[in-house]
């Protein structure tokens, strides 16, 4: 396999992931900001936080670190995920040669290789855990920038404050809870997403199903299938992993009070109530579902164009 043959394939996942992540991050930043503020205060409500917003532009506070984290993280994650899934497909002789597209087992709505449910679960979880660690410093800065507990006026001030007060460890605060949230979420998401792409065309009305001359779905049909699959899969995976998101946010906002995942979990259950573990779920559910629909819809179509 030549370098020229490898480059377009790998770069297509990098480009598709970057622009898909960037678009979803900027468009949905208000939901992320509101979710963070609801989670930081046990008495907070959506309406209370909305009343504290002085202008619509404040809903996009923290967009820069959020956009950096999501675009770079999405590009790295989807590139890493593709390498892992392609390697597994090659081992199973589904892809004897990565330069020969006719050997790849595809869904008709996608140009991604088809794997078993267990392989989708494991590759999704491992890739997300790895990339989550790499992008953790941006995540910590993003969460604190969105919060009302810290009044940072610039990214430089945020970085300096965290390093001065907590050292390098401060940039990885809450990684355990983040990994416990993101790795299972990503594994479940990839499993459900790939399965949905197979099942959804069977239940969609025939007027939505159109084929191109090559036998695959048209852009309209594949976008409908992929986006709907992404929204449904993200909704279920988000609900299951919601408690880890609350724990992670509390640890990053109040590191002196919440020192580890178990301590944070027991404190919330004992001093508040179990339902508080799902605090901000409505905001996260809306954001994650829409984000997955936007990001994966763009990603799948860009990959097809560049491959």
Swiss-Prot record:
GO terms for cellular component: mitochondrial inner membrane. Mitochondrial glycine transporter that imports glycine into the mitochondrial matrix. Plays an important role in providing glycine for the first enzymatic step in heme biosynthesis, the condensation of glycine with succinyl-CoA to produce 5-aminolevulinate (ALA) in the mitochondrial matrix. The chain crosses the membrane at residues 14-39, 62-88, 121-146, 174-197, 225-251, 280-298. It is found in: Mitochondrion inner membrane. HAMAP family: SLC25A38 (MF_03064). SUPFAM superfamilies: Mitochondrial carrier (SSF103506). It catalyses: glycine(in) = glycine(out). This is Mitochondrial glycine transporter. Belongs to the mitochondrial carrier (TC 2.A.29) family. SLC25A38 subfamily. Solcar repeats lie at residues 8-87, 115-199, 221-305. It is a multi-pass membrane protein. It comes from the Eukaryota. PROSITE patterns: SOLCAR. Keywords: Membrane, Mitochondrion, Mitochondrion inner membrane, Repeat, Transmembrane, Transmembrane helix, Transport. Gene3D superfamilies: Mitochondrial carrier domain. GO terms for molecular function: glycine transmembrane transporter activity.
